[in-house]
Amino acid sequence: MSSLRHATEIATTRWPAAAEPRPAALNHLHQLEAESIAILREVAAEFRKPVMLYSIGKDSSVLLHLAMKAFHPAKPPFPLLHIDTTWKFRDMIAFRDQRARELGLELLVHVNPEGLAQKISPFTHGSALYTDVMKTQALRQALDAHGFDAAIGGARRDEEKSRAKERIFSHRSATHRWDPKNQRPELWHLYNTMLAPGESMRVFPLSNWTELDVWDYIQLERIPIVPLYFAARRPVVERDGALIMVDDERMPLRPGETPQWRSIRFRTLGCYPLTGATPSTASDLAAIIREMRTSRTSERQGRVIDRDSAASMERKKVEGYF
């Protein structure tokens, strides 16, 4: 495994010559942008100590760009928080550090110390336990340790059915639990931000965006993203119906497995052992957008953690997962 070289390097986003966005599409994106910026400003005005969760993916990149716009020329009045499972793609970590440094933002990184001490990994403990310990419990630890009362994230309603029924301002109990049967109405863009002692709020400014909206906005605003979203030849193994990229020497190969170099890209990014790639030749933004316009599958089809059970995402969210 040590002979497998690092397949990709941090690079600037590829900007091919592209047609100007249609006026209707441009107006739609501007409306989404205005709504998201208003939500970010509402969070800054209403909460004592907010934080923005930065998962390094395309949605987080758009959210970070919106936050920079919302408070320009000042910096966003909240830090970034990354929950590091220690199993993210190497390109993601390099990109995370690069963006925080370029923008001069405060970046908080938290790893669950108990999970680290127990050497919890997706290979030895399974995806369900690993996700609970290294993501859900780690997030709760970080929010409690810093006393954050609002956590902003880039989840969208079109991603997954449990997220589709969640409010933009999503109330959490003092133990960070979500009750899908007890949600607050959000009529006419009016949000109830009241919290009892110990409670908190999760806020989703991109709730009404679609995957295609995100890509159109990335192209329009020239937002830097992780190179893994672009197709390139990378080492993968086919495992349990998913193309898993061999990102470092820690990944144990099963009997008969040999990494093959294939042209792939990722529609969604997470921990590399639990994130399936998509065969693709879309190596620039225009090609990705063309691909998205004809896609009939969910971007989360490659997420192994979503296969735990039919209601796994909702259960995770009830327990405190973002």
From Swiss-Prot:
Its EC number is 2.7.7.4. Pathway: Sulfur metabolism; hydrogen sulfide biosynthesis; sulfite from sulfate: step 1/3. The keyword Transferase applies. This is Sulfate adenylyltransferase subunit 2. It catalyses: sulfate + ATP + H(+) = adenosine 5'-phosphosulfate + diphosphate. Heterodimer composed of CysD, the smaller subunit, and CysN. Gene3D superfamilies: HUPs (3.40.50.620). HAMAP family: Sulf_adenylyltr_sub2 (MF_00064). InterPro entries: PAPS_reduct_dom (IPR002500), Rossmann-like_a/b/a_fold (IPR014729), SO4_adenylTrfase_ssu (IPR011784), Sulfate_adenylyltrnsfr_sub2 (IPR050128). It comes from Bradyrhizobium sp. (strain BTAi1 / ATCC BAA-1182). Keywords: ATP-binding, Nucleotide-binding, Nucleotidyltransferase, Transferase. One of its GO terms (molecular function) is ATP binding. Signal peptide: none annotated. It comes from the Bacteria. One of its GO terms (biological process) is sulfate assimilation. With CysN forms the ATP sulfurylase (ATPS) that catalyzes the adenylation of sulfate producing adenosine 5'-phosphosulfate (APS) and diphosphate, the first enzymatic step in sulfur assimilation pathway. APS synthesis involves the formation of a high-energy phosphoric-sulfuric acid anhydride bond driven by GTP hydrolysis by CysN coupled to ATP hydrolysis by CysD.
